Amino acid sequence: MSAPQWFVPVKAGDAKVPAYYPTDDMIQEQKKKLRTRKGAKITALDKPAWNLEKLRKSIVPGAILIIVAGKYAGKKVVFLKQCIKSGALIVTGPFKINGVPLMRINQRYVIATSQKVDVSKVDTTGVDVKFFKKIAIKKAAFGKTVEEDFAKKQYEAKKALIVEKQKQVDESIVAEIKKVPYLKEYMASYFTLKNGDHPHLLKF
């Protein structure tokens, strides 16, 4: 049996042992194994959260939801997909019909209806946590700085990206909404309750 490459012979009676052994051959073997890995690189945003909230059975892509709390309470939105990092629902009015933009909302603040819209052709690529992250512009104490100018450019670029994505999503969804009679008027109307109405007994 031949000795390994890193083996260093020691004379009889010599108790001195080298402190380090050459490991170049081992490192090369490890690098070869790393190169053989296949598949696309998975980033942190592509991995779903370990505690991702499960959606109700009635909340499926394309379902029309009624917002019951917040700034847009009473308005209807179309559910696009679930954010894999926060578990929030990504919805849109669409903005062209009722003024509700692309936004995130928790499922506890919506009521799902039986009406659905085909959203298979809607491109939601890039609409994730990073898409909704706000860019804060902090003014320096002594006038403008390079960092402030750079932040403003980032803010304008982000704003243009959001507007362009909103137009793209609205174009696809509005086309599907127009296929269903009176659905456009339904999406534009507010949801209200009258005296004697019980939400838990209503069928949406």
UniProtKB/Swiss-Prot annotation:
It comes from Entamoeba histolytica (strain ATCC 30459 / HM-1:IMSS / ABRM). Component of the large ribosomal subunit. Belongs to the eukaryotic ribosomal protein eL6 family. It is found in: Cytoplasm, Cytosol; Cytoplasm; Endoplasmic reticulum. Coiled coil: none annotated. The lineage of its organism: Eukaryota, Amoebozoa, Evosea, Archamoebae, Mastigamoebida. Keywords: Cytoplasm, Endoplasmic reticulum, Ribonucleoprotein, Ribosomal protein. Component of the large ribosomal subunit. The ribosome is a large ribonucleoprotein complex responsible for the synthesis of proteins in the cell. Its main location: cytoplasm. The keyword Endoplasmic reticulum applies. One of its GO terms (cellular component) is cytosolic large ribosomal subunit. GO terms for biological process: cytoplasmic translation. SUPFAM superfamilies: Translation proteins SH3-like domain. This is Large ribosomal subunit protein eL6. It comes from the Eukaryota. GO terms for molecular function: RNA binding; structural constituent of ribosome.
